[in-house]
């Protein structure tokens, strides 16, 4: 007979529960306050554009939240499409060309034309400012 057959399974005793440490308000140090996590939004940029186009018009917090969600959604769609285009062409970098093509694919007709022209203008302006 083997030695394994004669051995009985070890019985496990339940682990002893230790009393939980009580947390008191005096143990919290006043100098160690928890910092609020920053949430990045497009609110300040949306507000600046609003004031450029309609200086005397305001915007509610709910409307700002909706516009912020809209900008995040469009950004995500364009980035996703540009990523697919880069993968199709076996490139690891998303360039201005992929972004431009993604905009043409996602936005309809005239809106795509205006977006491409504004994007081209912004890239040209940025390029000229970095060279100077």
Swiss-Prot record:
Positions of modified residues (Phosphoserine): 11
UniProt KW Cytoplasm keyword: no
Region of interest: Disordered: 1-40
Cellular location(s): Nucleus; Chromosome
InterPro entries: Histone-fold (IPR009072), Histone_H2A/H2B/H3 (IPR007125), Histone_H2B (IPR000558), HISTONE_H2B_site (IPR055333)
GO CC terms: nucleosome; nucleus
CDD domains (UniProt xref): HFD_H2B (cd22910)
PTM: Monoubiquitinated by the UBC2-BRE1 complex to form H2BK123ub1. H2BK123ub1 gives a specific tag for epigenetic transcriptional activation and is also prerequisite for H3K4me and H3K79me formation. H2BK123ub1 also modulates the formation of double-strand breaks during meiosis and is a prerequisite for DNA-damage checkpoint activation.
Sites bearing N6-acetyllysine, chain numbering: 7, 12, 17
Annotated crosslink Glycyl lysine isopeptide (Lys-Gly) (interchain with G-Cter in SUMO) location: 7, 17-18
Covalent link Glycyl lysine isopeptide (Lys-Gly) (interchain with G-Cter in ubiquitin), residues: 125
Keywords assigned: Acetylation, Chromosome, DNA-binding, Isopeptide bond, Nucleosome core, Nucleus, Phosphoprotein, Ubl conjugation
SMART domains per record: H2B (SM00427)
Composition skew (Low complexity), residue ranges: 1-13
Single Gene Ontology MF annotation: structural constituent of chromatin
One Pfam assignment: Histone
Complex formation: The nucleosome is a histone octamer containing two molecules each of H2A, H2B, H3 and H4 assembled in one H3-H4 heterotetramer and two H2A-H2B heterodimers. The octamer wraps approximately 147 bp of DNA.
Protein role: Core component of nucleosome. Nucleosomes wrap and compact DNA into chromatin, limiting DNA accessibility to the cellular machineries which require DNA as a template. Histones thereby play a central role in transcription regulation, DNA repair, DNA replication and chromosomal stability. DNA accessibility is regulated via a complex set of post-translational modifications of histones, also called histone code, and nucleosome remodeling.
Homology family: Belongs to the histone H2B family.
Protein name per UniProt: Histone H2B.1
Annotated organism of origin: Eremothecium gossypii (strain ATCC 10895 / CBS 109.51 / FGSC 9923 / NRRL Y-1056)
């Amino acid at each position: 007979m083997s030695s394994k057959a004669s051995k009985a399974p070890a019985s496990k005793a339940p682990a002893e529960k230790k009393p939980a440490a009580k947390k008191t308000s005096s143990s919290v140090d006043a100098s160690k306050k928890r910092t609020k996590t920053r949430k990045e939004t497009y609110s300040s940029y949306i507000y600046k554009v609003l004031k450029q186009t309609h200086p005397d018009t305001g915007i509610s917090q709910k409307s700002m939240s909706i516009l912020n969600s809209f900008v995040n959604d469009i950004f995500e769609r364009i980035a996703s499409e540009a990523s697919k285009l880069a993968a199709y062409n076996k490139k690891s970098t998303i360039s201005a060309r992929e972004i431009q093509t993604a905009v043409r694919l996602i936005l309809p007709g005239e809106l795509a034309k205006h977006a491409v022209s504004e994007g081209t203008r912004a890239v040209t302006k940025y390029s000229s400012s970095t060279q100077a």
